């Protein structure tokens, strides 16, 4: 009635009579390599490390923000468009809500570069000290070999000319969606 010896499959002997279930669904690509955590290259209150940047950010924060946004968005948003949105938000809300827009780019940048919080959330940093936060982000991009003043296209071209980014930090490709 029962077999004398139970049948056990080993790694060299596949189990017969059992078919693997069919694979269905949408193929999912594996996520890219995890970004290693690193530290900010300068402090939040190190604005005077670059007096030119400090002055530009105090008098025209829309320019500083626009440059940062273009690089963080990898050219998907132009400096002019991001700066204009920042300025319109500042003007139409009485300089009360523009920091909400800029804090989203700080979060994107931290995620791309593996940077830690500076003790509080990104929105709190931008709400309490918008110019210092923008200066820190700008300095960080520069410290990683990206010059926001040049724009994304020139930075990407420089990376391509340096043997696919040797000595220069390149971001992983962006997730693309459908568009016109």
From Swiss-Prot:
Belongs to the cornifelin family. Expressed in roots, leaves, immature ears and silks. Detected preferentially in silks. It is a single-pass membrane protein. Keywords: Membrane, Transmembrane, Transmembrane helix. This is Cell number regulator 7. Pfam families: PLAC8. The keyword Transmembrane helix applies. InterPro entries: PLAC_motif_containing. It is found in: Membrane. The chain crosses the membrane at residues 80-102. One of its GO terms (cellular component) is membrane. It comes from the Eukaryota. NCBIfam families: A_thal_Cys_rich.
């Amino acid at each position: 009635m029962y077999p004398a010896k139970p049948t056990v499959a080993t790694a060299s002997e596949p189990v017969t009579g059992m078919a693997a279930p069919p694979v269905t669904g949408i193929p999912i690509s594996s996520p890219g390599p995890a970004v290693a955590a690193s530290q900010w290259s300068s402090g939040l209150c190190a604005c005077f490390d670059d007096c030119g940047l400090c002055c530009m950010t105090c008098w025209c924060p829309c320019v500083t923000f626009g440059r940062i946004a273009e690089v963080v968005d990898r050219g998907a948003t132009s400096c002019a468009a991001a700066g204009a949105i920042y300025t319109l938000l500042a003007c139409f809300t009485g300089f009360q809500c523009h920091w909400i827009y800029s804090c989203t780019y700080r979060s994107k940048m931290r995620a791309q570069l593996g940077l830690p919080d500076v003790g509080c959330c990104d929105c709190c940093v931008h709400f309490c000290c918008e110019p210092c936060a923008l200066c820190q982000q700008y300095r960080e991009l520069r410290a990683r070999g990206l010059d926001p003043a040049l724009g994304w296209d020139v930075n990407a071209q420089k990376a391509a000319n340096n043997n696919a980014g040797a000595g220069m930090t390149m971001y992983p490709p962006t997730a693309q969606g459908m568009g016109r």
